[in-house]
């Protein structure tokens, strides 16, 4: 409770954020960095823009490539459209993801994009320009593998 309060989050909000971190991370060692990124976005009042929340909002867990049409859904779980945390968890958070939120890595990252090697890791960025470079590489890798949906 004390660690949650230090983050200006309730225990429920920690669970919600931990569920997003779990949905985003394929590797446990990356969870504290992802948690730190989302906490940075929350503290700056920036939309979370978390793809796992969009997949949840669309109720389509077959989505491998989030497209613009997915981002337009009017659903409070769509963190591309609604600021702050969604109203509830998008999945059951793990102890590891809860721990990652409560013991997040402090850094200045605001953006992340999956690596184009499909390792399950992310490239992190501090600026839009850095992020756009990473995103273009990943989009090209998706295109090369003919991943359209």
Predicted segments — roles?
Residues 1-149:
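Bacterial extracytoplasmic/cell-wall-associated proteins, especially those involved in peptidoglycan
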């Amino acid at each position: 409770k004390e660690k949650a309060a230090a983050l200006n989050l309730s225990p429920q909000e920690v669970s919600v954020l931990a569920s997003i971190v779990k949905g985003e991370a394929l590797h446990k060692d990356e969870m504290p960095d992802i948690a730190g990124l989302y906490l940075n976005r929350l503290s700056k009042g920036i939309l979370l823009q978390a793809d796992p929340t969009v997949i949840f909002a669309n109720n389509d867990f077959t989505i491998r490539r989030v497209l613009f049409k997915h981002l337009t859904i009017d659903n409070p779980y769509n963190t591309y459209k609604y600021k702050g945390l969604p109203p509830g968890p998008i999945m059951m958070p793990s102890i590891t993801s809860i721990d990652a939120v409560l013991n997040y890595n402090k850094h200045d990252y605001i953006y992340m994009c999956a690596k184009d090697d499909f390792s399950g890791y992310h490239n992190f960025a501090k600026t839009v320009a850095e992020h756009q470079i990473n995103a273009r590489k990943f989009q090209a890798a998706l295109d090369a593998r003919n991943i359209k949906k």
